Amino acid sequence: MENRWQVMIVWQVDRMRIRTWKSLVKHHMYISKKAKGWFYRHHYESTHPRVSSEVHIPLGDAKLVITTYWGLHTGEREWHLGQGVAIEWRKKKYSTQVDPGLADQLIHLHYFDCFSESAIKNAILGYRVSPRCEYQAGHNKVGSLQYLALAALITPKKTKPPLPSVKKLTEDRWNKPQKTKGHRGSHTMNGH
């Protein structure tokens, strides 16, 4: 019988970013208790040798599984040391891969308080509203003018440590164009 290949999207991520993300997940699971129902699977609990960890996030009758890998082939740059992240949405026997932005939105639908557009209606009706959104990563668009006006009145409280964002985990911070210093800056960068 020949080998059967399964292709999946794995986002290349440096190991320090993965370590930070894992510790944020564990902090909010065990200390702050904001990630209720989340399940963390260690590398030694997996049968796959390249799986570094898995985080299972229940979303109603479905779940989001964020798998971190190690020992993959290195990427284009030296610092891509074979670390990666796959994001999968599962419901019963069906599963599909999702991008980091959608993963954050799905998490935000089920977890963490939000100062959402429904707060505008409640504020107009005189009801008390939640003063802030705890999970800004779950929003990918600019709100309405009313929403922006109300949000400007209330300064968001910084959560320490921040909530774990899948989009932030997979963000490519290495391949952004570098800004060189001006004339008084580094002379090796501008050729003088």
UniProtKB/Swiss-Prot annotation:
Family under the similarity heading: Belongs to the primate lentivirus group Vif protein family.
Subunit structure as annotated in this protein's UniProt entry: Homomultimer; in vitro and presumably in vivo. Interacts with viral RNA and Pr55Gag precursor; these interactions mediate Vif incorporation into the virion. Interacts with the viral reverse transcriptase. Forms cullin-5-RING E3 ubiquitin-protein ligase complex (ECS complex) by interacting with host CUL5, RBX2, elongin BC complex (ELOB and ELOC) and CBFB/CBF-beta. Within the ECS complex, Vif interacts directly with host CUL5, ELOC and APOBEC (APOBEC3F and APOBEC3G) substrates.
Segments of this protein annotated with the region RNA-binding: 75-114
GO annotation, cellular component aspect: host cell cytoplasm; host cell plasma membrane; membrane; virion component
Domain notes: The BC-like-box motif mediates the interaction with elongin BC complex.
GO molecular function: metal ion binding; RNA binding
Subcellular location, record wording: Host cytoplasm; Host cell membrane; Virion
Region (Membrane association): 171-172
Residue positions where Phosphothreonine is found in the record: T96, T155, T188
Post-translational note: Processed in virion by the viral protease.
Recorded topology in the membrane: Peripheral membrane protein
Binding site for Zn(2+): H108, C114, C133, H139
Protein name in the entry: Virion infectivity factor
Keyword set, alphabetical order: AIDS, Host cell membrane, Host cytoplasm, Host membrane, Host-virus interaction, Membrane, Metal-binding, Phosphoprotein, RNA-binding, Ubl conjugation, Ubl conjugation pathway, Virion, Zinc
Primary subcellular site in the record, as a coarse category: host cell
UniProt motif (HCCH motif) ranges: 108-139
UniProt site (Cleavage in virion (by viral protease)): L150, A151
Motif (BC-box-like motif): 144-153
Other noteworthy facts: Vif-defective viruses show catastrophic failure in reverse transcription due to APOBEC-induced mutations that initiate a DNA base repair pathway and compromise the structural integrity of the ssDNA. In the absence of Vif, the virion is morphologically abnormal. HIV-1 lineages are divided in three main groups, M (for Major), O (for Outlier), and N (for New, or Non-M, Non-O). The vast majority of strains found worldwide belong to the group M. Group O seems to be endemic to and largely confined to Cameroon and neighboring countries in West Central Africa, where these viruses represent a small minority of HIV-1 strains. The group N is represented by a limited number of isolates from Cameroonian persons. The group M is further subdivided in 9 clades or subtypes (A to D, F to H, J and K).
Region named Multimerization: 151-164
Region (Disordered): 161-192
Induction cue: Expressed late during infection in a Rev-dependent manner.
